[in-house]
Swiss-Prot record:
GO cellular component, one term: extracellular region
GO biological process: arachidonate secretion; lipid catabolic process; phospholipid metabolic process
Location within or outside the cell: Secreted
Cofactor: Ca(2+)
Organism: Austrelaps superbus
Keyword Membrane: no
Keywords of this entry: Calcium, Disulfide bond, Hemostasis impairing toxin, Hydrolase, Lipid degradation, Lipid metabolism, Metal-binding, Platelet aggregation inhibiting toxin, Secreted, Signal, Toxin
Record family assignment: Belongs to the phospholipase A2 family. Group I subfamily. D49 sub-subfamily.
Catalytic site positions: 75, 120
Stretch forming the signal peptide: 1-19
A GO term, aspect molecular function: toxin activity
This protein's name: Acidic phospholipase A2 S4-30
Disulfide bond residue pairs: 38-98, 54-145, 56-72, 71-126, 78-119, 87-112, 105-117
Cross-referenced Pfam families: Phospholip_A2_1 (PF00068)
Length: 146
């Protein structure tokens, strides 16, 4: 990932924290962004997924607009399941590696870390498989995500 992309990702993360009115905390979003870049082999910058459709980015509601948005909805649901297990998915750090065929979780013994890593790896691979429709980026969610 290029340094400029990291700065953009950091700026997005900071603005999302401010917009959500929650105190700053360590997030695994940087790890998730690396998994996304690994899965799509750097073909699309991570920030393209931060405001896509009804579910990619902060929150989510309504009917997903396409396959990529369904990937984000599934990821949101996976994080919700992690929280039901007593995990903190946005704060869980884990060990992973990037192979030629995509990202994988590596040697994770703790249940919460493993669960969250699996959520993130599956989402990253789903993002890489799904078509990206520029028309679904930065949509009016109040109109399209009922």
């Amino acid at each position: 990932m290029y340094p400029a992309h990291l700065l953009v990702l950091l700026a997005v993360c900071v603005s999302l924290l401010g917009a959500a009115s929650i105190p700053p905390q360590p997030l695994n979003l940087v790890q998730f962004s690396y998994l996304i870049q690994c899965a799509n082999h750097g073909s699309r910058a991570t920030w393209h997924y931060t405001d896509y459709g009804c579910y990619c980015g902060s929150g989510g509601s309504g009917t997903p607009v396409d396959e990529l948005d369904r990937c984000c909805q599934t990821h949101d649901n996976c994080y919700a399941e992690a929280e039901k297990k007593g995990c903190y998915p946005k704060m869980s750090a884990y060990d992973y590696y990037c192979g030629g065929d995509g990202p994988y979780c590596r040697n994770i013994k703790k249940e919460c870390q493993r669960f969250v890593c699996d959520c993130d790896v599956e989402a990253a691979k789903c993002f890489a498989r799904a078509p990206y429709n520029d028309a679904n980026w930065n949509i009016d969610t109040k109109k399209r995500c009922q």
